[in-house]
Curated annotation (Swiss-Prot):
Alphabetized PANTHER family for the sequence: DNA-DIRECTED RNA POLYMERASE I SUBUNIT 2
Family: Belongs to the RNA polymerase beta chain family.
The organism of origin for this protein: Halorhodospira halophila (strain DSM 244 / SL1) (Ectothiorhodospira halophila (strain DSM 244 / SL1))
Name of the protein described by the UniProt record: DNA-directed RNA polymerase subunit beta
Reactions listed under catalytic activity: RNA(n) + a ribonucleoside 5'-triphosphate = RNA(n+1) + diphosphate
């Protein structure tokens, strides 16, 4: 593999032993592909997939017919326009990034008499705005970035289950079947303790299941024949009964008479018939057996028995034979009857008992019964009952299994075909509908006599009979993923259905009044549904933007909650647990702690959803024991059929599995298998974990609970001022940084033309440009913008002018990335030792050096907004002329009343001056006089300026002013506008300049050395054009030269034309952008002006901040110790962090210790390289040392491909330490770490003697020291510390509010009162309960006394006493307080 431009500057040593078969796929593919499939905007209109996305939704609702059938609205196609604003503009203006959706419809009017088409009108209808996905898989809604989380829900289909013996006291298992459609009514079948089968529709009251079958048109006979085998008896004269013998059916029965065959008695009366007896009977070839008459008693007749003479029914189907009935059959001369074959073992009489419990006698009665159950209290009519039943399961408008549901359904009931109708199909029912229904005829032709409902019942009875298995609903073959596209499509369809109802009403008017399609369709419901989904659905979440990793994990999250999913309260233990099918699909580690544990999961690294929405994961194919590089994706359903080896199974040189027995997975169990049985093999050891977990080095040495915390805490790391790559990584860092979208990658290869802190200009290589376009890519970098979590998002260039970059190379770093690698924290020199009790309970001790060097300083950006509204009393005004405010308070404002950029402000400072008109009150004569003298301003406004909130100080880094259309812009707004326009102009000018330079360079190549006919500045006929001549001539006059070769003249003309059109294009683009900038802003109603001020706040590390490693080893900083007091090593290097050694053994996260050792070795090797560079070692010596470091074990590097300069740069970058990658489950082992420590000249034990910085004495035993990668988490003490003197009070109780957000007080609760009582501190207690809490009069007196310098207090009546009195009175008990005074 060739190194990319940034990779070769700092090569990470990879300790992985296993080959890299499959690169990590694009991490945001699930989101991006799903939405692309939904919009299909890059696909031409006729090539779109008609089953999915917007196209699918439109086609499922259209065409819409009027009630009379004379008018029809047909859908033709849709198109998505261009978004009016770019993503960044939407974010700053608080808009939704969306594009207009327009639908082309055709209105057809039919002629009643003639039967032809009378009139057709086509028109495009605006259907509202469709939110677009940004390139990184997010949506911008009202200016904030949001993510739509994938949902894991129960797949549609049929499921068989039992109640685990909970319903009945005997513990009997009651089986049930449930048909779950994608949309429509649920259908449940269940057994009761008496083994009758009941049906429920939509979980309503249960009815015997045969009612449903009768409603479908089945007669009792048909029902019985569908579910039972029958025995045939011949009745002869003299009450002789002969049975057509099927020997297997006798097995297990006790013979009530001697069974005789071929003259010998095979089974004696009273003996049980065994398998041996059955074999003997089969051998003897007996086909009929004479049985005694009473053998019939208790058998159930399978059909109606009719007297041949009179036509009278002697016995109905499902009648149990008694001696009397049997006799009547003999008397009537019936020759043959069939009875149901049932036994206690594996042929239960369930359907028969159900039929006996069913009181209905006909199809109509059954329909009425179902109608009564669904619509209790409504009088049933024939039509209503038939209609209701038909719409429940048999119309595609109301019921849809979806392709997934149909596939799952068919496979579960044992059919081979995965396709089928979206409704429940029953041949008998559709045949009964008659020829009126065209759709029914098509279905009957296609699917014949099959019946979905009968198949489900058969399977259910089979399971009850002990022949089948119930389903595991937590199996990932029974749960599927719904992504953005699918959810948006469902919402869109719901909106369209609402539109359809309105259109149906108006279509009848269209005939009479000649309306156009636009007047028929009101798109508001669609727009409202979409807006509601993206803005406030439970699964549309505010993006977690702490750092690049948290963005990626948020987009790969899979939630079982949300609409149509589970709820926290209802979810049991099984749903949350790790399931064997999670392997390679869902991460077993990364999930939140707390109430959501196991309900919110993360996609595994190689997992993806297939076309049905089931998660599948990658495997290598194994053929006859030889491992191939062919990769196949298997879903959980397919996987259980195969034998799958693990990624670390030993493979010899020729690719054959090396061991005799190999650890494998088969049918969700771990087993050992021989090499020839293995069919697949994992592609990578990190296949089973998610992105966040795969970033934890030595994960295999950590306990699962701590690994979970480690994976979760990496997402909370705050980007530091200077990112520092981890010395010990896992090799995933570059992938995550690239796919997160925070780094700028080259879209096309080329040469860097220009770089500054704000943008990078690349001149694209000729082979990557299309003809006629300027071969220039301009990358604007984002500087100091606020993320969703108020952290700072800023990019800085990595390239220099003249660098050659290829497509996909990193051009600029973003937050928490270092040279294109994810860098969430800093490498710290740590020692595991106690230090004066400051390590108690996982506290962490740090050196002052970290604060001094700003290692963990982070910048947080706060956005403060000031809104000037139009009020009843007049409009608010943003101004620097504020009443009763000192000059010094206004010193940071400009003439418009807005703070300068760069001003350092602290709590309480004015950022935007604003005055609001006050209500008119009755003026005194003096005030009238003052107003007459000083004008209006004196008293009629109050100061409502935007001030810096408490506990915040920082620097103003940006100000934005938004002005309503039609309101005059102030000076500040105009200045901001001018800057913006200048910036756009500069970008376009640069692009144009590079394009022109390029064109003239091509012209020069074309003209120099060719013969001219004539030209300006005395170029004669036949003269040769020289370079010097062209340099003297102004460029625009080059086109006046006439050449002898006509082809060259044509090329000259073509270039001139190209330049002109390009200039026009640039000018047009500039005008467009300028218009956007100068236009007024679309503000919410009543708002005249909005000013947004961004403050940058620097947060240094301080005691109380949360600090953590990557192994779940978290703690709070307890103290910052001067550098000179920290323990130091032999060479005088003080350690930077002291961790508690007790944090390791009980937590079992040994990974942190291994990381510390390897980090120390990595740093030591960097030190050695640094020394070699100082001694100016030659290239060969450096190459030799590097190959010793890189190539002794693990993956080999191609250092020989580097040039000398590249080698020097690499060594220079390695001085701070040689970065190592120890992939998850395939990392460095103890021997390799020791080798590195030895190579770096460090003790192989990883321990060294430390000396106390205060006394200089050596500690009494060697201490583990090394480099650990540590993160500062976004739980900063600055956001939590809070104090109050006076502040707001609660309205009813008059007690201070609680919490920092309300500027509340500290609660002095029940227990604290007990403490004071125990001390007997009566006066302190009184003060706490009265003046410091809810004694209103006492509070005001106290304030007055303090002002007067008198420090006494008088306690009055606490307000809570009055509240208590009122509460007692509300119970109807009068209570009065009698005062002595």
């Amino acid at each position: 593999m060739a190194y990319s431009f940034t990779e070769k500057k700092r090569i990470r040593k990879d300790f992985g032993k296993l080959p890299n078969i499959l690169d990590v796929p694009y991490l945001l593919a699930t989101q991006v592909d799903s939405y692309r499939q939904f919009l299909q905007d890059e696909v031409s209109e006729d090539a779109r997939d008609t089953e999915v996305g917007l196209e699918g939704a439109f086609r499922s609702v259209f065409p819409i017919q009027s009630h009379s059938g004379n008018a029809e609205l047909q859908y033709v196609s849709y198109r998505i326009g261009d978004p009016p604003f770019e993503v960044k503009e939407c974010q700053s203006r608080g808009l939704t990034y969306a594009a207009p959706l327009r639908m082309l419809v055709r209105l057809a009017l039919y002629d009643k008499e003639g039967g032809g088409v009378k009139d057709i009108k086509e028109q495009e209808v605006y259907m509202g705005e469709m939110p677009l996905m940004t390139s990184t898989g997010t949506f911008v809604v009202n200016g904030t970035e949001r993510v739509i989380v994938n949902q894991l829900h129960r797949s549609p289909g049929v499921f068989f289950d039992h109640d685990k013996g909970k319903s009945h006291s005997s513990g009997k298992l009651l089986f049930s079947a449930r048909v779950i459609p994608y949309r429509g009514s649920w259908l449940d079948f269940e057994f009761d303790p008496k083994d009758t089968i009941y049906v429920r529709i939509d979980r309503r009251r249960k009815l015997p299941a045969t009612i449903l079958l009768r409603a479908l048109g089945y007669t009792p006979e048909e029902i019985l024949y569908a579910f039972f085998d029958t025995d045939r008896f011949h009745l002869g004269s003299g009450n002789k009964v002969v049975l057509d013998l099927v020997p297997e059916r006798l097995r297990g029965e006790t013979a009530s008479f001697d069974i005789v065959a071929g003259g010998e008695t095979i089974v004696e009366a009273g003996r049980r018939v065994t398998a041996r007896h059955v074999k003997q009977l089969q051998k003897s070839g007996v086909e009929q057996l004479e049985v005694p008459e009473d053998y019939l008693t208790g058998k159930i007749i399978a059909h109606d028995v009719i007297d041949p003479a009179t036509g009278e029914i002697l016995a109905e189907a499902n009648t149990t034979l008694t001696p009397e009935i049997t006799q009547s059959l003999f008397d009537a001369g019936i020759r043959e009857i069939e009875t149901l074959f049932v036994n206690d073992l594996d042929r239960g009489p369930y359907m028969s008992t159900t039929l006996a419990a069913d009181a209905t006698r006909s199809q109509m009665e059954a329909l009425v019964e179902i109608y009564r159950m669904m619509r209790p209290g409504e009088p049933p009519t024939k039509d209503a009952a038939e209609n209701l039943f038909h719409t429940l399961f048999f119309t595609s408008d109301r019921y849809d299994l979806s392709p997934v549901g149909r596939m799952k359904f068919n496979l579960r009931v044992g059919r081979d075909e995965v396709r089928g109708p979206g409704i429940l199909y029953d041949g008998k029912y559709f045949a009964g509908l008659g020829n009126a229904d065209k759709e029914a005829d098509d279905l009957i032709e296609q699917y014949g006599e099959s019946s979905d409902i009968l198949d489900v019942l058969r399977e259910l009875i089979d399971i009850r009979n002990g022949n089948g298995q119930v389903d595991d609903i937590d199996h990932l073959g029974n749960r599927r993923v719904r992504s953005v596209g699918e959810m948006a499509e469902n919402v869109f369809r719901v909106g369209l259905v609402r539109v359809e109802r309105a259109v149906k009403e108006r279509l009848s008017l269209a005939e009479s009044e000649g309306l156009m399609p636009q007047e028929l369709i009101n798109a508001k419901p669609v727009a409202a549904a979409i807006k509601e989904f993206f803005g406030s659905s439970q699964l549309s979440q505010f993006m977690d933007q702490n750092n690049p990793l948290s963005e990626v994990t948020h987009k790969r999250r899979i939630s079982a909650l949300g609409p149509g999913g589970l709820t926290r309260e209802r979810a049991g233990f099984e749903v949350r647990d790790v399931h064997p099918t999670h392997y390679g699909r869902v991460c077993p580690i990364e999930t939140p702690e707390g109430p959501n544990i196991g309900l919110i999961n993360s996609l595994a690294v190689y997992a993806r959803a297939n076309r049905y929405g089931f998660l599948e994961t990658a495997y290598r194919k194994v053929v006859d024991g030889q491992v191939t590089d062919q990769v196949e994706y298997l879903s959980a359903i397919e996987e259980s059929r195969y034998v799958i080896a693990q990624a670390n199974a030993r493979v010899d040189e020729s690719g054959y599995l090396a061991d005799d027995l190999i650890s494998c997975r088969h049918q969700n169990e771990f087993t050992m298998a021989t090499a020839d049985r293995v069919q697949y093999m994992d592609v990578s050891p990190r296949q089973i974990v998610s992105v966040a977990a795969s970033l934890v080095p030595f994960l295999e040495h950590d306990d699962a609970n701590r690994a979970l915390m480690g994976a979760n805490m990496q997402r909370q790391a705050v980007p530091t001022l200077r990112a520092d790559k981890p010395l010990v990584g896992t090799g995933m860092e570059r992938t995550v940084a690239r796919d997160s979208g925070v780094i700028v990658t080259a879209e096309r290869g080329g040469v860097v033309e220009q770089v500054d802190s704000g943008r990078i200009v690349v001149r694209v290589d000729d082979e990557e440009t299309t003809p006629g376009e300027p071969g220039v890519d301009i990358y604007s970098l984002t500087k100091y913008t606020r993320s969703n979590q108020n952290t700072c998002f800023s990019q800085k260039p990595l390239v220099h002018v003249g660098d050659r970059v290829a497509r996909g190379d990193a051009l600029a770093d973003g937050p928490s990335t270092d040279m294109g690698e994810l860098a969430l924290g800093q490498n710290m020199l740590v020692a595991f030792m106690p230090w004066n009790g400051y390590n108690f309970e996982d506290s962490i001790l740090i050196s002052e050096k970290l604060v001094k060097e700003d290692r963990y300083t982070s910048v947080h950006i706060e956005e403060l907004t000031c809104v000037a509204r139009d009020t009843k009393l007049g409009s608010e005004e943003i101004t620097s002329d504020i009443p009763n405010v000192s000059e010094s308070a206004l010193s940071r404002l400009d003439e418009s009343g807005i703070v300068y950029i760069g001003a350092e402000v602290k709590a309480g400072d004015i950022l935007v001056g604003k005055v609001t008109p006050k209500g008119e009150t009755q003026l005194t004569p003096e005030e009238k006089l003052l107003r007459a003298i000083f004008g209006e301003k004196a008293s009629d406004v109050k100061d409502t300026s935007l001030r810096v909130p408490t506990g915040m100080d920082g620097t103003v880094i940006d100000v934005q002013v938004f002005t309503r259309d039609g309101v005059e812009k102030d000076e500040r707004a105009r200045a901001i506008e001018r800057e913006e326009i200048a910036r756009v102009r500069k970008d376009l000018d640069d692009e144009a300049r590079i394009f022109e330079d390029d064109a003239y360079a091509r012209l020069e190549k074309l003209l120099v050395g060719k013969v001219a006919e004539g030209g300006p500045k005395g170029l004669g006929s036949g003269a040769e054009v020289t370079e010097a001549y062209l340099q003297d001539l102004p460029r625009e006059r080059w086109f006046e030269i006439r050449m002898r070769d006509e082809a060259v003249n044509q090329q000259l003309e073509a270039v001139r034309h190209q330049l002109e059109t390009q200039r026009d294009r640039f000018e047009r683009r500039f005008q467009e952008k300028k218009e956007k900038i100068t236009a007024g802003d679309d503000l919410s109603p009543g708002v005249l002006k909005t000013v947004k001020v961004h403050l940058a706040v620097k947060r240094r590390l301080q005691p109380g901040d949360k600090f953590a490693g990557r192994h779940g080893n978290k703690g709070v900083i307890s103290m910052i110790v001067p550098e000179e007091d920290m323990p130091y090593m032999d060479d005088g290097t003080p350690v930077e962090v002291v961790l508690s050694p007790l944090g390791v053994p009980s937590r079992m996260n040994v990974g942190q210790v291994l990381e510390t050792h390897l980090g120390w070795a990595a740093r030591g090797l960097g030190h050695q390289i640094g020394q070699m560079l100082e001694q100016q070692a030659d290239a060969e010596a450096l190459r030799g040392y590097l190959s010793e470091i890189y190539d002794a074990s693990g993956r080999k590097e191609e250092l020989e491909t580097l040039s000398e300069e590249e080698l020097q740069e690499l060594c220079h970058n390695l001085k701070g330490g040689v970065p190592a990658a120890t992939p998850v489950f395939d990392g460095a082992n103890e021997g390799e770490i020791k080798r590195w420590l030895k190579l770096a000249g460090l003790p192989e034990s990883g321990q060294t003697t430390l000396y106390d910085g205060r006394t200089g004495d050596a500690f009494d035993r060697p201490i583990t020291v090394g480099y650990m990668y540590m993160l500062k988490l976004n739980h900063l003490v600055d956001d939590k510390v809070h104090a109050r003197a006076t502040g707001p009070y609660s309205l009813v109780t008059q007690q201070p509010l609680g919490g920092k957000a309300q500027f509340g007080g500290q609660r002095f609760g029940e227990m604290e009162v007990w403490a004071l009582e125990a001390y007997g501190a009566a006066y302190t207690l009184q003060e706490m309960l009265t003046v410091k809490s809810d004694d209103v009069s006492g509070r005001t007196k106290m304030y007055k006394n303090i002002v007067d310098g008198d420090h006494r207090m008088e306690a009055g009546m606490p307000e809570s006493f009055n509240v208590l009195v009122k509460e007692i009175r509300s119970l109807g008990i009068n209570i009065e307080l009698e005062r002595d005074d």
